[in-house]
Design a protein with these regions (language model features):
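Consensus positions within tandem repeat domains that build extended binding/scaffold surfaces
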Residues: 15-20, 45-46, 82, 102-105, ...
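Structural signature of tandem-repeat unit edges
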Residues: 1-13, 22-40, 51-72, 76-79, ...
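Beta-strand repeat architectures
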Residues: 45-53, 173-174
Length: 174
């Protein structure tokens, strides 16, 4: 039962679903050289999809691409939320420094409630896909909602998006 991942210093990329359904995995520590989560394609999933016990990400302080804050993974500038661990909590307030929710950042997590600040402008591709417990979202200042951003959020019953300019293909597909 895999509980922790500590990668070699040479690790640069983790591909889609590399650790999918490792249900005992609790912590992931990313090394200095790590640079890429391969989740850009419409057919790729979060490398940690289905890791239901995942509590926190940790990043080597010398990494120039990513950093973790309170267990959540962000880009180095902390303007993009990259990945949210499933056991972080079922309610989360997006920090004020975040501008973009990254592709597949919350995919498949058990989050029930997300509080968006007025600084979030974009929700990436499949960012909340398969978040079956998510009930409502208020996308205060979000302008762009990418494809499948909230796809298969089967409990979603209320969405407010007063400033939306672009809603992607299958953004709210059931």
């Amino acid at each position: 039962k895999l509980k922790e991942l500590h990668f070699p210093a040479s690790l640069k990329t983790i591909s889609c679903e590399a650790f999918s359904d490792c249900t005992s995995l609790e912590q992931v520590s990313l090394p200095e050289a790590f640079a890429v989560f391969d989740v850009q394609s419409a057919f790729r999933s979060n490398p940690f999809k289905g890791c239901t016990a995942l509590r926190a990400f940790h990043v080597d302080s010398r990494n120039v691409h990513f950093q973790a804050y309170e267990g959540v993974l962000y880009d180095k500038e902390m303007t993009t939320l990259v990945a949210y661990p499933n056991q972080k909590g079922d309610t989360f307030s997006i920090p004020a420094f975040v501008r973009w929710i990254g592709n597949r950042a919350f995919e498949g997590t058990m989050v029930r409630s997300i509080v968006f600040t007025d600084n979030v402008e974009r929700v990436g591709m499949s960012a909340f896909r398969n978040c079956s417990q998510l009930k409502q979202v208020s996308l205060n200042c979000v302008v762009d909602i990418d494809r499948q951003a909230f796809g298969y959020c089967t409990s979603l019953c209320k969405v407010e998006m007063p400033y939306a300019e672009t809603i992607g293909l299958y953004a709210f597909e059931r």
